[in-house]
């Protein structure tokens, strides 16, 4: 074992003696030298991967580096790295800028702002369905027409996923965030033009605009978590990002029944509806401004080794369609797409039709129907947070996903056979139990998908999961609605139980191929540091201490 300690001052003042280091003849130290095509480094710095020392000394490929300094891996995606001798001429400050692993304090601001405008958009999705019967009376339309105010969110997502996912790769997080929040704001204000019984088409237009905004939102949680958070925080961060969407649904169940009472006078009803629309319009506008001010594209440094590798592997001419083809060749991911769609689709159908089911068993209980929906989502948010923290600690993605899926099935069965007991408190308990697992599953699916598909784009993988959810959501909502109208709520819920049982069985066949975790483990250990804002302008750097494992 040979240990060489490189002195800072000597490396800056003079090159290494020829007897100490000798360059490979294929490597050029001149700034004008050619760059080997197989190596991806900082945009302005690349080197030949084969660097040898003195002829009598062979440097082993496994080189340990001081935790404060990280060296960019080669594009072969192998985690091993080679230390750069002090005699090599390169822009060291630029290399350090791109290779140091740090997490930014801004990361929590970014994820919280995203959660807030995701909350606002989710509220607008469910605000009609939570008081389905009131809007039916106000606009003079059928229950199926009101259901489409919810289902348009699902339908719009399907054709727009691929263009928006491409935009996410092409233009980045900030552009997508601003576009999504702007559309969300616009849709909220358009609805204010629909405060007359004959203006149902206007409220539909506003809802469609909000549904387009949703396409710019749903695929973001796993991408934000990967780009901004460290390896031990990604699952928690993804849960926080999804948390906002779930909280918006919860508020959408709770607030509309309170703000819009079930009264017959159209003018008074229009006044109460306008209050709700003005509130959501003001909130959406404030959040749009907030996104412009605080949302950044990405942190100064990659927050994890896996993200650093992702930067190194990224190419500007990468084929977007080829990425999708690779994903569909991944059997484990295909199974997850199906199982996630079954679970999330059941949740969408249950949320859309909940008011109708509760009113059938408990007439006049619109407010309590909203509270039951609130209970489902609040319990699910706790489930999501607990699952995220557990995944960060245990990394048991397959096992956790399977257990949560099975418990979702159990909760759905219990809810199905207790709804007709005519005890409202029993419905609250069973619905809360169902929500804890059903809603808690949603962020698990996102994170499991990223693990199975790394280093493919998180936006593409999560987008495909959401397409599956929207397709099953439309099918389940229409089918269950028809079953409820013709055969009652029990058979409608049994319909969902059958598909949740199928999803549980398919989940058991998914292999735990955790590629992102392997990338983090196989790469050299790196001490993750909190990025101090005042350090961003500093050019000071530490020189690595290189340990050569073999002579």
From Swiss-Prot:
User: Subcellular localization, per the record?
Assistant: Cell membrane; Mitochondrion membrane; Endoplasmic reticulum membrane
- A biological-process GO annotation: endothelial tip cell fate specification
Q: Which UniProt keywords apply?
A: Cell membrane, Endoplasmic reticulum, Membrane, Mitochondrion, Phosphoprotein, Repeat, Transmembrane, Transmembrane helix, Transport
Q: Where are the sequence repeats?
A: 31-36, 37-42, 43-48, 49-54, 55-60, 61-66, 67-72, 73-78
According to its UniProt record, which reaction does this protein catalyse? choline(out) = choline(in); ethanolamine(in) = ethanolamine(out); heme b(in) = heme b(out)
The record's listing under InterPro entries reads: FLVCR1-2_SLC49-like, MFS, MFS_dom, MFS_trans_sf
Extracellular compartment residues: 125-142, 193-199, 260-264, 362-365, 420-422, 487-488
Disordered: region residues: 1-87, 519-551
Show the GO MF annotations: choline binding; choline transmembrane transporter activity; ethanolamine transmembrane transporter activity; heme binding; heme transmembrane transporter activity
According to the UniProt record, where is the region 8 X 6 AA tandem repeats of P-S-[VSG]-S-[VIAG]-[HDRL]?
31-78
**Basic and acidic residues bias locations:** 519-529
* UniProt topological domain (Cytoplasmic) ranges: 1-99, 171-172, 229-233, 295-330, 395-396, 453-460, 512-551
Q: Where is the composition biased (Polar residues)?
A: 22-87
Per the record, the domain of life is: Eukaryota
Known Pfam families for this protein?
A: MFS_1
Reported consequences of knocking out the gene: Late gestation lethality due to reduced brain vascularization. Endothelial cells fail to adopt tip cell properties and display reduced sprouting, leading to vascular malformations. Conditional deletion in endothelial cells suppresses the import of choline from blood and results in microcephaly-associated vasculopathy reminiscent of Proliferative vasculopathy and hydranencephaly-hydrocephaly (Fowler) syndrome.
Which positions does the record annotate as the modified residue Phosphoserine? 541
Membrane topology term: Multi-pass membrane protein
Q: What is its main location?
A: membrane
Which residues of the sequence carry a binding annotation for choline? 121-122, 125, 214, 218, 348, 470
Q: Which family, according to the similarity comment? A: Belongs to the major facilitator superfamily. Feline leukemia virus subgroup C receptor (TC 2.A.1.28.1) family.
Q: What does this protein do?
A: Choline uniporter that specifically mediates choline uptake at the blood-brain-barrier. Responsible for the majority of choline uptake across the blood-brain-barrier from the circulation into the brain. Choline, a nutrient critical for brain development, is a precursor of phosphatidylcholine, as well as betaine. Also mediates transport of ethanolamine. Choline and ethanolamine transport is not coupled with proton transport and is exclusively driven by the choline gradient across the plasma membrane. However, the presence of an inwardly directed proton gradient enhances choline uptake.
Q: Domain note for this entry?
A: The N-terminus contains histidine-proline motifs involved in heme binding. Can bind 2 to 3 heme molecules.
Put simply, this protein is called Choline/ethanolamine transporter FLVCR2
Protein species of origin: Mus musculus (Mouse)
Chain's gene name: Flvcr2
